[in-house]
Design a protein with these regions (language model features):
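N-terminal "arm"/small-domain region of PLP-dependent enzymes with the aminotransferase-like
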Residues: 162-198, 535
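Flexible, glycine/small-residue-enriched loop-and-beta-strand segment within the central core
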Residues: 1-12, 18-122, 157-163
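PLP-dependent aminotransferase-like
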Residues: 236, 240-317, 321-333, 337-342, ...
Length: 572
């Protein structure tokens, strides 16, 4: 040890610690095999782990914990007081008793570049990299690269060597990665609500509504508490009356029909197109021609229920829009309202042959419903939804329905519901919204890669995307005739899957009162036992996709899988 060093007796030094000249250490702990550069000061109650390198002219203050394998560049400054002052509020010089240390933790494997300043009461995550000269004001996620003043996340580094990736589990959906990427923005949104006590309604919700309307190319966006509420309120606001029939498909999540029933309407079904899994225009036409009549007043009435048919709800399933030109043409001919269930289709587009342009989901019907369930392409950190419409009267009715029927506080024009989106979720959605277009593009790239790897494989049927569709691949769904065995095989190899959905709605016990039977919707019933959702999320890697396909194809070939033949649908 050099005579130029000041190392107090209370310093704990591990084995093979190397100390350069002109250092000042007191009350701290430095563990095995760590190197301390020249002109470094480390204060009491600071800890430096094993195999760390602390470069020259760095100041590590009281309350800092540095874990193993950390690199600290030259001239890095740590702080431990958010509001440093020389005197107390009474004007007296501060003493140690007046000082409240705010701790900082540098997790293992992190690197901090030269000249960086680390503010107190935060954490630098494992393997994170802080750029030279950065001013770090917030905690840094694991594996993040941050730079600037204030430091912002630029990108992420691999958390583990690629050689281990062949054994790592592949989730069906990764909700951790996107939140890790946006951790600073999401934390800011949450902190804003805490600091302003803005929890229900208010400017944060209004700002998100405006932004989502712009994103969707709609005139109005009304934020509500869930996608189910969004659809229910849209049905009611569009003028569907209790006892009216609303036509939809049986191949969807039950929330679609729940919204119809809870609006006191009656769901009736038409079959799907076998290629897109969405509402078949042919089957809708057959329903309207063969299963409906006009009564004496000219109303369209269902022969099944004897009730007036007033609306159609096409679902943009899995992130792909239904064939809206055909549906809208039929609806116009029969005087029906069209309400889009766009809960899985944020940003999806449809090329309208009628209008000769691409049109976004949520703007072709009289109104549309979106869900912000966490797993959606735009997901909250909880529940949420929105109604989009170009009709200001519908927008006003939805606003009234979501808030106890109020036109203003404590003045109620109707009985409504408690269906508001809270401001915390609105802030989180606002932070995520600018990234949705890029995430959707990444989903399309992942789908194209799956398609490339599986094209020509007879044992597995890949999704079909018509020329008029720009799907956003909320889900990537294939078909195979031994789905349950394949799910078990993929689970055994660490690959997550989903089934959307295993039992069609007309065969669910909840709708036994509708008196549908097996065989009523042959396309839906041929599809549901075979559909299998493979891992799909923007951060899915090419290596992971190759592994998924390898396991899917090899199992399908060995087991003799083959999807059912297409069922021809006609107007007969």
């Amino acid at each position: 040890m050099s005579t130029f060093n000041c190392v107090a007796d209370d310093v704990k030094l591990g084995k093979n610690v190397r100390l350069s000249k002109f250092i000042n250490l007191y009350g701290c702990e430095i563990q095995d095999d760590t190197k301390i550069g020249a002109f470094v000061e480390i204060q009491k109650n600071a800890t430096v782990g094993r195999r760390c390198k602390i470069s020259s002219h760095t100041f590590i203050c009281e309350g800092v914990t540095i874990e193993d394998n950390v690199f600290i560049g030259h001239g890095v400054m740590f702080t431990n007081d958010s509001y440093p002052r020389s005197t107390t509020a009474a004007g007296q010089m501060q003493t140690e008793a007046d000082w409240k240390v705010e701790p900082t933790v540098i997790r293992k494997g992190a690197s901090i570049g030269s000249g960086a300043t680390i503010l107190p009461n935060l954490e630098i995550g494992e393997n994170a990299i802080v750029g030279a000269g950065a001013v770090v004001t917030k905690s840094v996620p694991a594996n993040a690269i941050v730079a600037g003043n204030p430091a912002k996340v630029l990108r992420f580094v691999e958390s583990q060597p690629a050689v281990e990736e062949d054994e790592a589990p592949i989730p069906f959906l990764d909700l951790i990665a996107p939140h890790r990427e946006l951790e600073n923005e999401l934390t800011d949104a949450f902190r804003h609500s805490l600091r302003t006590a803005g929890f229900v309604g208010g400017p944060v919700v209004e700002k998100f509504e405006e932004a989502f309307a712009t994103f969707s190319d709609a005139k109005h966006s009304i934020a509500v508490s869930s996608g189910t509420d969004a659809l229910r309120f849209a049905i009611m606001a569009c003028g569907v009356q209790p006892g009216d029939v609303v036509v939809t498909v049986p191949n969807t999540f039950i929330a679609t029909t729940e919204a119809i029933s809870q609006a006191r309407a009656i769901p009736e079904f038409v079959d799907i197109d076998e290629q897109t899994y969405n509402m078949s225009v042919v089957m809708l036409q057959r329903y309207l021609e063969k299963q409906c009549i006009r009564d004496r007043s000219g109303r369209l009435v269902s022969l099944r229920s004897g009730r007036p048919v007033t609306a159609v709800i096409p679902i943009h399933l899995y992130g792909q829009m239904a064939d809206m030109d055909g549906i809208l043409e039929l609806a116009e001919s029969y005087g029906l309202i069209v309400i889009e269930d766009a809960c899985q289709a944020h940003g999806a587009e449809y090329f309208s042959r009628k209008h000769n342009r691409w049109i976004k989901a949520g703007t072709m019907g009289k109104a549309a419903a979106f869900s912000f369930y966490p797993g959606k392409n735009l997901g909250a950190c909880g529940e949420g939804g929105a109604v989009t419409t170009d009709d200001s009267n519908i927008a006003t009715k939805v606003k009234c329905l979501r808030d106890h029927g109020q036109v203003k506080k404590y003045y109620h024009d109707m009985e409504g519901y408690n269906g508001r989106l809270d401001a915390i979720q609105a802030g989180i959605l606002q932070a995520k919204l600018p990234h949705v277009a890029a995430w959707n593009a990444q989903r399309r790239e992942r789908a194209a890669e799956y398609n490339r790897l599986m094209t020509g494989e007879e044992a597995v049927r890949i999704p079909y995307e018509p020329s008029w569709s720009r799907a956003v691949y909320h889900l990537y769904v294939v078909r195979t005739n031994n789905r349950e065995e394949m799910i078990a095989h993929l689970k055994k190899t660490g690959i997550g899957t989903g089934v959307h959905y295993p039992v069609p709605l007309h065969l669910q016990r909840a709708y036994a009162s509708l008196s549908y039977s097996a065989g009523d919707f042959p396309v839906t019933e041929s599809v549901t036992p075979e559909i299998l959702s493979l891992p799909m999320f923007p951060q899915l890697t090419a290596f992971q996709q190759a592994r998924v396909v390898r396991e899917v194809v090899s199992f399908a070939r060995e087991s003799g899988s083959r999807p059912a033949e297409f069922i021809e649908t006609t107007l007969a």
